Amino acid sequence: MSSMTVLVLGSGGREHALALACHRDPEVAAVHVAPGNPGTASFATNHPLDPCDCDAVVSLARGLEADLVVVGPEAPLVAGVADALRESGIDCFGPSAEAAQLEGSKAFAKEVMAAARVPTAASRSCDDANSVSAALDEFGPPYVVKDD
C-alpha cells in the first residue's frame, strides 16, 4: 500500500533519476519535484521554487505533508536546506551544510585532504586575476581551473 509523499529538490538529470526511482517505489504515493524539469513533469508534480530558499522549501514540504525530502544538488545543501528541514522536524536525505562543504567548496576539500595527508594534486586558491596568472605560470600546462 503506497502512502509516502516525497519531495525531490533540483532540476537536473540526477534529480530526474531520483524522482523516477521514488515514483517507481510501491511505498510512494506521490512525488513532487522543485523546481523540476519537463521530464519530471511526466510523472511528478513540479513546483516553481528556488531550492536554495530554506524557508520556501520548508513551507512547501509542510504544505505537501512530505514524509521525505531528497536534496539532489550541492547548492541547496551548502545553503543549509537539509539543516532547515531537519530543524523543522521534516525527514531529509542529504548532508548538513557543514558536511556539504566537502563537495561544495574545492578549496575546503583540498584543505581537509591536506590536513588528513590524503594524496591529491597540487592546487592554489586565487582571489584575483594576477594571482591566477602567477599560479598558471608556476604550474604550467596542463592545468584545471575551478571556480569555488
Regions found by a protein language model. Give the residues of each.
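Active-site nucleotide/adenylate-binding loops and adjacent lid/helix of ATP-dependent enzymes
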Residues: 7-8, 102-148
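ATP-binding N-terminal substructure of ATP-dependent carboxylate-amine bond-forming enzymes
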Residues: 1-98, 130
